């Protein structure tokens, strides 16, 4: 019996141990399953090109498993595809730190650094990747592209040679090697490589386009046209071949066909500055002056620092009899390039027509002096272009052309006048109905127990703190306002401020801003130590200013134009200031120094007042209180771009994108390469 008891005790211990191990393994398997699940979902989003959702999913994975280097790697790829190059570089770096033999991470970080123009570090990463896995072909290809961009043509050829040893059926390798030979002025080998690329893949339009461009360069226009036709046959949306074929048509005196192809390019890419420029020239040649002027106006909008736009438009204005406008354009061309002798001569002739004899004489003397300098320095290509009076500036430009003052980039991706990047709006207490969007967003917000207690004390189920004003229909807002107005009459003294607070919110939501500010003021008199009342009065005061200024058609906001150093501007003569609203937020901060939203709101108003360094400090304080404050990262990033610290600004905006701000990736597309 005793032996049986001992046996049963031992068995119970063994059973308990087995059960514990089973539970432990089950927990580990569950955790592993979850990690694998998020990893799989992240990859699935990436395969569907939904990179923002991929980042959100991978963020969850990395919160639970900080050592998941593959998660950082995948998130880096997602950021790369959203043009968040700095963010991608940071994630690839973490992946490498956690796994120093992660060859693919070295390769992708190198590609990212190459796009950032950081060629030395990119080449170092490629070297690491190749040393780790010399049998992998892709690093050779990518390093070859980087060396090509860095104008190391012979070294690039060597890399493409190594890639082709492993992968003989990749047409792009032959195209790139051919381009290298072309830069080395070895057109025979360039043709050989382009021909091989075509034989390797007869459906690849890039091969025909490259060979056609070389034919065109050698004035073999029939052969060039045939290649561009074939490229378009392979891909009817291949922009480069339409563009190049338009050049061929123009060279062979077929302006109608040239215009048709340029129209097609613009239907595929409506922001291509160089295409508008070329179409303006062709339209001028056929006498379609008014539409040519429209095209020049677009180019001046997209590339405002381009000297030839103003010079050619001045000539066009002269044809149209707009002499004063022509003079203004010649003047602009001279401002952009003071050695432009032809512009002085053109302006001199027009000033003579306007009977400005002294101005005409002065321009002629300056032009003569520039021409004399040119003739004494014929070896200087700058003088040979702009001081040569025999040179014409009405030839079509290729995609590789560069013009003084700015370069026409390939398929320029400039923004329209209305597409401006603004600060994300203020936070305030408002009425919002629960919906899935608000709930999803709210989970990432700053938690303040004091604010939660305040909401609970008010006791209104619609009360939320948000940067969205409301999602309630206008008719419902009017009914809510009527209810709260009646409630204020019945409120007891100890709860009067609550009724007044709710009434003020409803008044601001129906745009009765003056009434709302007055109501908040009365509420503050009843409860002067409540920071949230000051926060809302500040938000309402700021919103009232914006509303008034919008009526004057002069929004006070930060906008980033072509020049990243653009200033805060207000096009109207009236001035609006946010001093009272800023004072309210300062009071709120004194009453509750740990409230991140108050610093964020004050930073916004300081920025709109042109006080950028102070705004930067307040955004920084908000981020210290809430490191995952996405809007604060985004707005601080914009401020840093305005203060010409583009790299740090992009890092902040990258973080904002990682935290779910979709607008971040639009900004990064513009500034990723700066």
Residue positions per predicted region:
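Eukaryotic alpha-helical solenoid repeat scaffolds
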Residues: 319, 339-500, 505-507, 548-577, ...
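Structural marker of alpha-solenoid helical repeat scaffolds
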Residues: 64, 98, 132, 166-167, ...
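Canonical tetratricopeptide repeat
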Residues: 40, 74, 108, 142, ...
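Register position in tetratricopeptide repeats
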Residues: 47-48, 81, 115, 149-150, ...
């Amino acid at each position: 019996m005793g032996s049986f008891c001992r046996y049963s005790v031992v068995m119970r211990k063994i059973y308990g141990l087995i059960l514990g191990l089973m539970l432990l393994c089950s927990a580990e398997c569950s955790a592993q399953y979850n990690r694998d699940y998020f990893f799989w979902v992240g990859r699935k989003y990436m395969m569907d090109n939904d990179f923002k959702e991929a980042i959100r999913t991978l963020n969850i994975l990395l919160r639970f498993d900080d050592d998941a280097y593959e998660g950082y790697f995948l998130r880096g790829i997602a950021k790369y595809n959203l043009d968040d190059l700095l963010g991608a570089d940071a994630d690839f770096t973490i992946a490498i730190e956690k796994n120093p033999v992660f060859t693919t991470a070295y390769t992708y970080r190198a590609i990212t650094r190459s796009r950032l123009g950081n060629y030395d570090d990119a080449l170092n990463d490629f070297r690491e990747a190749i040393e780790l896995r010399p049998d992998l072909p892709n690093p050779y290809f990518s390093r070859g592209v980087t060396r090509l961009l860095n104008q190391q043509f012979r070294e690039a050829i060597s890399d493409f040679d190594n890639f082709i040893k492993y992968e003989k059926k990749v047409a792009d390798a032959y195209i790139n090697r051919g381009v290298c030979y072309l830069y080395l002025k070895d057109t025979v080998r360039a043709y050989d490589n382009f021909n091989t690329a075509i034989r390797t893949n007869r459906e690849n339009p890039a091969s025909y386009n490259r060979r056609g461009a070389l034919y065109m360069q050698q004035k073999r226009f029939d052969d060039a046209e045939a290649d561009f036709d074939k490229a378009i046959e392979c891909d009817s949306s291949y922009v480069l071949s339409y563009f190049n074929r338009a050049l061929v048509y123009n060279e062979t005196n077929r302006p109608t066909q040239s215009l048709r192809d340029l129209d097609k390019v613009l239907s595929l890419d409506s922001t291509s500055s160089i295409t508008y420029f070329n179409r303006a020239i062709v339209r001028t040649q056929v006498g379609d002056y008014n539409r040519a002027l429209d095209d020049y106006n677009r180019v001046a909008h997209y590339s405002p620092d381009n000297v030839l736009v103003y010079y050619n438009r001045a000539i066009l204005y002269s044809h149209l009899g707009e002499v004063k406008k022509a003079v203004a354009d010649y003047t602009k061309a001279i401002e952009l390039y003071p050695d432009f002798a032809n512009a002085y001569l053109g302006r001199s002739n027009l000033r003579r027509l306007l009977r400005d004899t002294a101005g005409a004489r002065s321009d002629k003397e300056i032009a003569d002096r520039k021409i004399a300098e040119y003739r004494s320095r014929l070896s200087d290509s700058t003088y040979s272009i702009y001081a040569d009076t025999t040179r014409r500036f009405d030839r079509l430009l290729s995609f590789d052309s560069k013009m003084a003052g700015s370069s026409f980039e390939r398929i320029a991706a400039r923004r329209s006048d209305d597409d401006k990047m603004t600060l994300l709006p203020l936070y305030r207490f408002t009425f919002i109905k629960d919906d899935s969007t608000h709930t999803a967003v709210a989970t990432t917000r700053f938690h303040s127990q004091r604010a939660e207690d305040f909401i609970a004390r008010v006791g209104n189920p619609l009360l939320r703190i948000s940067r969205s004003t409301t999602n309630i229909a206008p008719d419902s807002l009017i009914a809510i306002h009527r209810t709260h107005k009646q409630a204020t009459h019945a409120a007891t003294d100890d709860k009067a401020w609550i009724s007044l607070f709710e009434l003020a919110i409803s008044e601001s939501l129906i745009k009765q801003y003056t009434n709302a500010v007055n109501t908040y003021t009365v509420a503050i008199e009843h409860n002067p130590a409540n920071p949230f009342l000051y926060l809302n009065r500040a938000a309402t005061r700021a919103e009232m200013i914006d509303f008034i200024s919008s009526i004057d058609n002069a929004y006070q906001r930060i906008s980033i134009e072509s020049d990243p150093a653009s200033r805060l501007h207000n096009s109207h003569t009236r001035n609006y200031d946010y001093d009272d609203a800023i004072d309210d937020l300062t009071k709120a901060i004194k009453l509750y120094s740990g409230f991140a939203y108050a610093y964020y709101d004050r930073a916004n108003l300081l920025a709109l007042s042109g006080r950028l360094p102070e705004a930067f400090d307040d955004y920084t304080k908000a981020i210290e209180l809430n490191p995952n404050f996405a809007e604060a990262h985004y707005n601080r990033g914009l401020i840093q771009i305005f203060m010409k610290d583009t790299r740090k600004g992009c890092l902040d905006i990258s973080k904002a994108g990682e935290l779910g701000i979709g607008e971040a990736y639009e900004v990064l597309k513009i500034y990723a390469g700066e």
